[in-house]
From Swiss-Prot:
<comment type="similarity">
    <text>Belongs to the prokaryotic pantothenate kinase family.</text>
</comment>
<keyword id="KW-0418">Kinase</keyword>
<dbReference type="InterPro" id="IPR004566">
    <property type="entry name" value="PanK"/>
</dbReference>
<keyword id="KW-0808">Transferase</keyword>
<dbReference type="GO" id="GO:0005524">
    <property type="term" value="F:ATP binding"/>
</dbReference>
<keyword id="KW-0547">Nucleotide-binding</keyword>
<keyword id="KW-0173">Coenzyme A biosynthesis</keyword>
<comment type="pathway">
    <text>Cofactor biosynthesis; coenzyme A biosynthesis; CoA from (R)-pantothenate: step 1/5.</text>
</comment>
<dbReference type="GO" id="GO:0004594">
    <property type="term" value="F:pantothenate kinase activity"/>
</dbReference>
<keyword id="KW-0067">ATP-binding</keyword>
<feature type="binding site">
    <location>
        <begin position="94"/>
        <end position="101"/>
    </location>
    <ligand>
        <name>ATP</name>
    </ligand>
</feature>
<dbReference type="Pfam" id="PF00485">
    <property type="entry name" value="PRK"/>
</dbReference>
<dbReference type="InterPro" id="IPR006083">
    <property type="entry name" value="PRK/URK"/>
</dbReference>
<keyword id="KW-0963">Cytoplasm</keyword>
<dbReference type="GO" id="GO:0005737">
    <property type="term" value="C:cytoplasm"/>
</dbReference>
<protein>
    <recommendedName>
        <fullName>Pantothenate kinase</fullName>
        <ecNumber>2.7.1.33</ecNumber>
    </recommendedName>
</protein>
<dbReference type="GO" id="GO:0015937">
    <property type="term" value="P:coenzyme A biosynthetic process"/>
</dbReference>
Length: 315
């Protein structure tokens, strides 16, 4: 970090080696087998990546969480109350195919294994998409993931209830197999110590929803936000490669919403994936996701093979 660079940006910038050095003496608590189970269908997640990127991040988060708990204790002492358990909320945003889910799962595993043994829940905002029938009725099936495709009132109420100390809060669950919210498939979240909220839209604010104005937003309740970033050419490549793997795997299931794609030749599949990327996911990235990047507390930038090459931490 040059002095001039540090002064001109709201972020502290670290290359991979600088960030890895901040691990200090935090022990590795995951085995190679566990790491293999955490990674996404299209990602290379190594022991080295966890040690050099995610362990320093978990150390930083542990400091923030401990500080937050001390602040809560001070408030309780001042008020003379025994406070409710209020979860620390971490949000993870970024493009489709960038690896948000893997980042979320790795952090969940690491944070739950700190000596404090905190309980960590993971929720994706996919569950808060409107059901397919609603999207069809509104002509929004090709806008899945865009702001107007979400039940934002329900998502905001979910995080608001958690931050208000409500003992049991329910979240809808999304199935990528049927490409829809699971009817009556709600998951109950019971006052975890930490909630990781992962999704395309978790950094968006009211200005991103002019069609559906309300005064509070998800980002108002988030304690620490992460944006997983990568160059657009890599994102497109990862999206297409993931589509090809799904074509040979999940799409072959007769119950899959995309079962017809399993019958495509490789060239047809590549062309289909490229079209889906350009017409839907790239458009959403440019219009609604990328503009929220600089709202994040921390930005992780990936290079080839999903390896993080740079970390920017808000001062």
């Amino acid at each position: 970090m040059s002095k001039e660079q540090t002064l001109m940006t709201p972020y502290l910038q670290f290359d991979r080696n600088q960030w890895a050095a901040l691990r200090d003496s935090v022990p590795m608590t995951l085995t190679e087998g566990e790491i293999a189970r955490l990674k996404g269908i299209n990602e290379d997640l190594s022991l080295e990546e966890v040690a050099e990127i995610y362990l320093p991040l978990s150390r930083l988060l542990n400091f923030y969480i401990s500080s937050n708990l001390r602040r809560q204790a001070v408030l309780e002492q001042f008020l003379g109350t025994n406070g409710q358990r209020i979860p620390y909320i971490i949000s993870i945003a970024g493009s489709v195919a960038v690896g948000k889910s893997t980042t979320a799962r790795v952090l969940q595993a690491l944070l739950s294994r700190w000596p404090e043994h905190r309980r960590v829940e993971l929720i994706t905002t996919d569950g808060f998409l409107h059901p397919n029938q609603v999207l069809k009725d509104r002509g929004l099936m090709k806008k899945k993931g865009f702001p107007e495709s979400y039940d934002m009132h329900r998502l905001v109420k979910f995080v608001s209830d958690l931050k208000s100390g409500v003992p049991n809060v329910t979240a809808p669950v999304y199935s990528h197999l049927i490409y829809d919210v699971i009817p009556d498939g709600d998951k109950t979240v019971a006052q975890p110590d930490i909630l990781i909220l992962e999704g395309l839209n978790v950094l968006q604010s009211g200005m991103d929803y002019p069609h559906d104005p309300h005064h509070v937003f998800v980002s108002d309740f988030v304690d620490f936000s992460i944006y997983v970033d990568a160059p657009e050419d890599l994102l497109q490549t990862w999206y297409i490669n993931r589509f090809l793997k799904f074509r040979e795997g999940a799409f072959t299931d007769p119950d899959s919403y995309f079962h017809n794609y399993a019958k495509l030749s490789k060239d047809e599949a590549i062309n289909t994936a490229a079209s889906l990327w350009k017409e839907i996911n790239w458009l959403n990235l440019k219009q609604n996701i990328l503009p929220t990047r600089e709202r994040a507390s921390l930005i992780m930038t990936k290079s080839a093979n999903h390896a993080v090459e740079q970390v920017r931490l808000r001062k």
